[in-house]
Design a protein with these regions (language model features):
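A conserved beta-strand-loop-helix scaffold within acyl/acetyltransferase catalytic domains
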Residues: 23-81
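Short amphipathic alpha-helix that is part of the acyltransferase structural core
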Residues: 1-31, 146
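Loop/helix-junction capping segments adjacent to catalytic residues or to phosphate/diphosphate-binding pockets
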Residues: 8, 85-88, 118-119
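Conserved glycine-rich acetyl-CoA-binding loop
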Residues: 80-93, 104-105
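Amphipathic alpha-helical "stalk" segments
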Residues: 15, 22, 59, 65, ...
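Active-site/acyl-donor-binding loops of N-acyltransferases
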Residues: 1, 97-146
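Intrinsically disordered, low-complexity regions of eukaryotic RNA-binding proteins
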Residues: 62-64, 89, 111
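A short, acidic, amphipathic alpha-helical segment used as a generic capping/interface helix at domain edges
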Residues: 55, 94-99
Length: 146
């Protein structure tokens, strides 16, 4: 279902939840006002009509968030929680909804922003017909100056 059909603020809350848990092991989001403001700012850029939410037992289980970026819309997709029941199937439904919607809008390209090691998006991405450049994020520790 389209994110715009949910109660106001729901998709933005889901963005915050998913962003937080997907980054907790390698780049934790702190509980500061600045971090909350940054996540809220990103959430305001979501295209709610094109964002897809998949339900399991009437509750949001996975979301394919869509950002209307120049050149190709960007899709960030994952389950609501790491341990969401039926997350793989729910995520597949959400991504399929976004792809069908893009086709209906005569879009020819979507950019997926995800991590190879995301527990549900990673395996799904390996099954998709992806092409083009892949980006690797490298984190290099900088020694403290004394």
């Amino acid at each position: 279902m389209a994110g715009s059909t949910l109660a106001p603020g729901t998709v933005e809350l889901l963005w915050s939840q998913i962003y937080t848990w997907t980054h907790e092991e390698w780049s934790p989001v702190d509980d500061s006002d600045e971090a909350r403001a940054a996540i809220a700012s990103e959430a305001r850029e979501l295209d709610l009509d094109r964002t897809a939410v998949a339900l399991v037992d009437g509750e949001p289980a996975a979301v394919a968030f869509v950002f209307d970026d120049p050149g190709a819309s960007t899709v960030c997709a994952e389950s609501v929680r790491r341990d969401t029941p039926d997350a793989d199937e729910a995520l597949t439904r959400a991504v399929a909804w976004v792809v069908r919607d893009a086709h209906g809008r005569s879009e020819h390209r979507l950019a997926f922003d995800g991590h190879e090691y995301d527990p549900h998006f990673g395996p799904l991405a390996r099954r998709l017909c992806l092409e083009g450049a892949r980006l690797s994020l490298l984190e290099i520790p900088v020694p403290e100056s004394h």
